[in-house]
A protein has these predicted regions:
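RNA pseudouridine synthases
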Residues: 1-234
């Protein structure tokens, strides 16, 4: 895992919330002892500000460890409750950028599937709606740009913008693979990818209302990963 400075990750902070650009390769929360993650690093950051007090940090949503992008954390239980309400009521905007090597027939579209998580393998798959444990997953995608790259099986990389309607486990990775557009660098859902590129997925845009004053908060980041290099539209 890469080393990182949590101070460099913080995009915004006030008494209620903390917004970060999570680096790829860093877990939001880790079960491994001694492994740096966003939660422990941010708690250490907060503890330095209030010595002697146990800092509160509410995890509102997550990104897979190999995924980079914007995350919001709550600094009070009240802020956490309000942000969770916005997540549940689908008033939070989440946009992603992804990279694939497969160009779909439709340059834009809506994907709707049912996914089931397998806790034993930490993976999800597309199943029938009546499968026990199945959860509806939907997203919208649109092709942004295509560039040449001899490292991929098709000789190209394709940038895709994705707007999430739901937030299921590994949703984008699973739905895109099922559609025939597996993400580059995805070791779990793209078995045919022989490139050494890291996972091409970034949470690039997050918008919500401030839990205390209702002000619209909007954050955008540019992906830093190798898989995104060369695209002019970033």
């Amino acid at each position: 895992m890469q080393s990182f400075n949590i101070q460099d990750c913080i995009l915004y902070e006030d008494k209620d919330i903390l917004v970060c650009h999570k680096p790829a390769g860093v877990a939001v929360q880790s079960a491994r002892f001694g492994m740096a993650d966003m939660e422990s690093s941010l708690k250490n950051h907060l503890a330095l500000k209030t010595p002697g007090k146990m800092p509160y940090l509410g995890i509102i949503h997550r990104l897979d460890q190999p995924v980079e992008g914007v995350l919001v954390f709550a600094k009070t239980p009240k802020a956490a409750a309000e942000l969770n309400r916005q997540i549940t009521s689908k008033t939070v905007t989440k946009e992603y950028l992804a990279v694939t090597a497969q160009l779909p027939e439709e340059k834009q579209g809506h994907l709707e599937d049912y996914l089931k998580k397998d806790n034993r393998t930490n993976s999800s798959s597309v199943v029938t709606p009546k499968t026990p444990g199945a959860k509806k997953a939907s997203l919208d995608y649109s092709i942004q740009e295509e560039i040449k790259d001899e490292r991929t099986a098709t000789g190209k990389r394709i940038l895709v913008k994705i707007i999430l309607d739901t937030g299921r486990h590994h949703q984008i990775r699973v739905q895109m693979a099922h559609k025939g557009m597996p993400l580059l660098g995805d070791r779990k859902y793209n078995a045919t990818d022989k490139s050494d590129l890291p996972l091409g997925l970034c949470s690039c845009h997050l918008a919500f209302h401030h839990p205390a004053n209702g002000k619209k908060m909007e954050f955008k980041v540019t992906p830093k990963g190798e898989t995104f290099k060369g695209f002019l539209t970033l």
